[in-house]
Amino acid sequence: MQEYIKNEVETLRLRAGATQEDLALRVNVSRQTIIALEKGRYTPSVLLAIKIAGFFKMPVEKVFKIHHGK
């Protein structure tokens, strides 16, 4: 069974009324990185995950979750 990280970044960002650019600027990455992250094509570093969770004022484990797939 393969493990992978799922995230709630897009859902939380939309709920917060923030654009991809807003989030990217706040966590010091490109908008393209946020796009890739939201589409599940990019797994963030621990530092970036902490910054993103901080942006939403949530624990990292509420934003990023380990899933088990086939």
Model-found features: residue ranges?
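Alpha-helical residues within the helix-turn-helix
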Residues: 14, 25, 54
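Short alpha-helical DNA-recognition segment
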Residues: 17-36
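Short, basic-rich loop-to-helix N-cap that marks the start of a DNA-contacting helix
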Residues: 41-51
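A short, Lys/Arg-rich alpha-helix, primarily the initiator
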Residues: 1-15
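Key DNA-contact positions within bacterial/archaeal DNA-binding proteins
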Residues: 32, 42, 61
